[in-house]
Amino acid sequence: MDSLDQCIVNACKNSWDKSYLAGTPNKDNCSGFVQSVAAELGVPMPRGNANAMVDGLEQSWTKLASGAEAAQKAAQGFLVIAGLKGRTYGHVAVVISGPLYRQKYPMCWCGSIAGAVGQSQGLKSVGQVWNRTDRDRLNYYVYSLASCSLPRAS
């Protein structure tokens, strides 16, 4: 049986090669990628660059205590965003279910202006996308309503 977050993974796959901002592929734009995934799922998302998005998530979404809790919520079908503000540009990613890297970092999907080193198509954890200093400062936010659910029996 698929994990309940399969619809989120599918939205990530569908958003990867699209452009949220004209001319900028989502795989090269973390905030555009997250915006596209949220739009596909019908989830309201704060607008702007990653720093602005983290500010908005802090105000309107529920903050989670750990990467393990973030992975658990993702496995339950909730859209979970990992984010960290930066001096100029921060970074945001979509958390998905799966094994925790080093027992605390959840798997993720994210675009990045840094190219392959900062990108993940669900095969890297936030602990591999962010550097060793920043990965322990990440915040995790969950949307209040589940984005995925089990199919109804016919």
From Swiss-Prot:
It comes from Pseudomonas aeruginosa (strain ATCC 15692 / DSM 22644 / CIP 104116 / JCM 14847 / LMG 12228 / 1C / PRS 101 / PAO1). Forms a heterotetramer with Tsi1 consisting of two Tse1 dimers and two Tsi1 dimers. Formation of the complex inactivates Tse1 enzymatic activity. Its EC number is 3.4.19.11. The active site is at residues 30, 91. It comes from the Bacteria. This is Peptidoglycan amidase Tse1. Transmembrane segments: none annotated. InterPro entries: Papain-like_cys_pep_sf (IPR038765). SUPFAM superfamilies: Cysteine proteinases. It is an enzyme of class 3 (hydrolase). Toxin secreted by the H1 type VI (H1-T6SS) secretion system into the periplasm of recipient cells. Degrades peptidoglycan via amidase activity thereby helping itself to compete with other bacteria. To protect itself, the bacterium synthesizes immunity protein Tsi1 that specifically interacts with and inactivates cognate toxin. Its main location: host cell. Keywords: Disulfide bond, Host membrane, Hydrolase, Membrane, Secreted. Disulfide bonds join 7-148.
